[in-house]
Structure formats: structure tokens, C-alpha cells
């Protein structure tokens, strides 16, 4: 059995409705996924299943999500060992220790090309930092300027399918995998 994490892009279903994590777990169980569990109510699902193709697993989850909740949501899946590598690759450990809610990673379905990551530097604010690691985008956001230009610059339209998680979530998911 292989352990995976599924990251939902959004848990907002519209009209003030949100995905209930118990319903998300039930959906996973209905797919035959073992030991499904969630971390915080922001769309982080950890589970076990036989080793399988990530793209096919993402597609299965997305189809089941739309059938269960009536809305398509992009879902990015990573193997536990890949998540541990992502967490260990955090290029901003000092900032993560000081302000973990201000450090985030944009986890990408497909690695961001180096040239696309380089163009993001133009959007980095005075008190911000950005670095691409392993095809994902790490950002240190400024507390002084809460409306970062990087948020729009890292959108699906510009970089492809991805979803962001702050350092607290990254770390806690890694701990769920024994990291």
C-alpha cells in the first residue's frame, strides 16, 4: 500500500456551502481508498491505496468529487515520499519558523517551467520572497502588504493547475507521513 495526499483546489461549493470533511472521507471510502483522514477543513485528504498512476488517481477523485458534491474541483495528488521531499525542500526555513502562516507553497500538477518561474520575480513585493523548487513555487508573503501581486501572478491561467498551502499545513501533512 502507498500513502497519498490529495489537495483540493477549493472546498467552496457556492451559495455559502462548503465541503464537509466527513463527506469527503466518505467519498474516499466509496472509492475503496483505505484509512482516509483529513487535515483541517481546507481540503487535505490523506489515504492509502495500491501504488497507482497519479494522473489516473487525480481523475478518479475529481470525477467522484463532482458526482458527490455537484461541482468540479481540481485535485492534486502527491505520494507521501514526494510530500516529504517537498517539505524538506522549503527554501525559507527561518521565515517558516518565525511566521509559518506567511510562507506558502503553490503545489503544481505539472512542474512550472523555469522561464515561467523567472517571470514571477517581477511580481515579488518589497518584503516578499519567491523561489521555485522542484516545479512548485514557494513564497514568503509580507505581513505589511497583505494584498500581494503574486497571488494573481500564480493563477491557473498563468501557471497551470495548482493549489496553495501554508507552511503550517505542509508541516502537519508531513508529520502525518512520519516526517
Where do the model's predicted regions map?
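Surface-exposed, charge/polar-rich loops and edge strands
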Residues: 2-179
Amino acid at each position: 500500500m502507498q500513502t497519498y495526499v490529495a489537495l483540493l483546489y477549493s472546498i467552496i461549493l457556492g451559495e455559502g456551502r462548503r465541503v464537509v470533511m466527513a463527506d469527503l472521507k466518505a467519498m474516499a471510502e466509496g472509492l475503496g481508498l483505505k484509512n482516509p483522514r483529513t487535515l483541517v477543513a481546507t481540503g487535505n485528504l490523506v489515504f492509502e491505496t495500491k501504488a497507482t498512476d497519479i494522473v489516473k488517481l487525480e481523475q478518479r477523485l475529481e470525477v467522484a468529487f463532482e458526482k458527490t458534491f455537484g461541482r468540479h474541483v481540481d485535485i492534486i495528488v502527491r505520494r507521501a515520499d514526494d510530500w516529504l521531499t517537498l517539505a524538506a525542500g522549503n527554501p525559507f526555513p527561518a521565515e517558516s519558523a518565525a511566521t509559518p502562516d506567511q510562507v506558502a507553497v503553490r503545489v503544481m500538477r505539472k512542474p512550472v517551467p523555469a522561464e515561467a518561474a523567472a517571470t514571477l520575480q517581477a511580481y515579488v513585493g518589497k518584503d516578499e520572497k519567491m523561489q521555485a523548487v522542484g516545479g512548485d513555487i514557494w513564497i514568503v508573503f509580507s505581513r505589511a502588504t497583505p494584498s500581494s501581486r503574486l497571488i494573481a501572478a500564480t493563477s491557473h491561467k498563468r501557471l497551470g493547475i495548482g493549489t496553495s498551502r501554508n507552511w503550517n499545513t505542509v508541516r502537519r501533512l508531513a508529520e502525518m507521513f512520519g516526517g
